[in-house]
Amino acid sequence: MTEYKLVIVGGGGVGKSALTIQLIQNHFIDEYDPTIEDSYRKQVTIDEETCLLDILDTAGQEEYSAMRDQYMRTGQGFLCVYSITSRSSFDEIASFREQILRVKDKDRVPMIVVGNKCDLESDRQVTTGEGQDLAKSFGSPFLETSAKIRVNVEEAFYSLVREIRKDLKGDSKPEKGKKKRPLKACTLL
């Protein structure tokens, strides 16, 4: 059975733990208890393939940022989560992505941009279009989710697994700075 190492990143209070617990335990946690680092495992079937999701729920608070490099090194794919009710959490996503790319020394890493708390439409500070544009600029899928009313929760994690699978199939591509040289044929006369 294939195991996928998923890492969920984003600012404090955007709902990373709520999304993860909704996926794993099918319930919504409404009290805010800042995470330092939690790990969850769940066996699921995605596109008729049974696999094991190893999900690392990370700290959003800046005081734990020193821990980020380590989990970014080991993760295969990343859910970059912001809250649609927080402009600042949206603005942080680009720096999370840059840090991931730097740590992994790659131009592209399997990633999905997630706008959480879509049930709080009246408090929206970030439009759906802004989220779509950001994800498009990254070459990543985009979803709006709600851990509270369970909108697109499974789809967010499953889409990330599909991105990892695509990446693994194309893994023979050269990494940043390492270009494959074309084969040259010589003709002797």
UniProtKB/Swiss-Prot annotation:
One Pfam family of this chain: Ras
Region (Disordered): 169-189
Biological process according to GO: actin filament organization; adenylate cyclase-modulating G protein-coupled receptor signaling pathway; aggregation involved in sorocarp development; asexual reproduction; cell morphogenesis; cell-substrate adhesion; cellular response to cGMP; chemotaxis to cAMP
Positions of the propeptide segment: 187-189
Record's subcellular location: Cell membrane
Membrane-related topology note: Lipid-anchor
Stated regulation of activity: Alternates between an inactive form bound to GDP and an active form bound to GTP. Activated by a guanine nucleotide-exchange factor (GEF) and inactivated by a GTPase-activating protein (GAP).
Motif Effector region per UniProt: ranges: 32-40
GO cellular component: cell cortex; cell leading edge; cytoplasmic side of plasma membrane; lipid droplet; macropinosome; pathogen-containing vacuole; phagocytic cup; phagocytic vesicle
One Gene Ontology molecular-function label: G protein activity
EC identifiers of the protein: 3.6.5.2
Record's subunit section: Interacts with ripA.
Family per record: Belongs to the small GTPase superfamily. Ras family.
Family matches, as NCBIfam families: small_GTP
Protein role: Ras proteins bind GDP/GTP and possess intrinsic GTPase activity.
Stated name of the protein: Ras-like protein rasG
Organism, as annotated: Dictyostelium discoideum
